Design a protein with these regions (language model features):
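N-terminal basic, low-complexity leaders that serve as flexible interaction/assembly modules and, when applicable
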Residues: 1-60
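Active-site-proximal, glycine-rich beta->alpha crossover segments in alpha/beta enzymes
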Residues: 57-157
Length: 157
């Protein structure tokens, strides 16, 4: 959609996700243009990674890149368990989108599962074979379980 491309030309993915007005605007664009059954909030499953202490970037042509990936127990221990307040931008985008939708269609939200978040955090981005994830899982089970627990608490908090 042209209006989406215009916003993307001015703002990064993270900027669109972290700015409630922009995220709500992107959420509403398809609803305002097409007769759809529901709206999906514009966000990304990796948003919790930054406030937890990981450096996240959406590199052009590469997708998400974590510049300080989790590789061992010490890295897991450094990750903060954040509360909902750390992602107020998403909650505010949801409020704004719901207000603008005014009941026309339902608003769908989503979150990344602990394994998915861990895989990105460990691999440093997307992966085809998840070798580093498997390595941590099998060679450092204590670190793996602690990481799963942290991500589970973050996405349910």
């Amino acid at each position: 959609m042209a209006e989406n491309r215009a916003l993307r030309a001015k703002h990064s993915i993270l900027e669109l996700c972290k700015t409630p007005e922009l995220a709500a605007q992107v959420t509403l664009q398809p609803i305002d243009r097409f007769p759809l059954d529901a709206a999906i909030i514009f966000a990304d499953i990796l948003l919790p990674l930054e406030p937890m202490g990981l450096s996240l970037e959406f590199a052009e042509g590469e997708g998400p890149v974590i510049h300080n990936p989790v590789r061992d127990q010490a890295d897991v221990e450094r990750l903060k368990v954040i509360d909902g307040g750390e992602l107020d931008c998403v909650a505010e985008a949801i409020r704004q989108a719901r207000r603008a939708l005014n009941g026309r269609v339902p608003l769908i939200g989503f979150a990344g599962a602990p394994f998915t978040l861990a895989s990105y955090a460990i691999e440093g981005g997307s992966s085809r074979n998840y070798l580093l994830t498997k390595q941590l899982m099998y060679c450092e089970p204590k670190a793996w379980h602690q990481l799963m627990d942290k991500f589970a608490r973050v996405i349910t908090g």
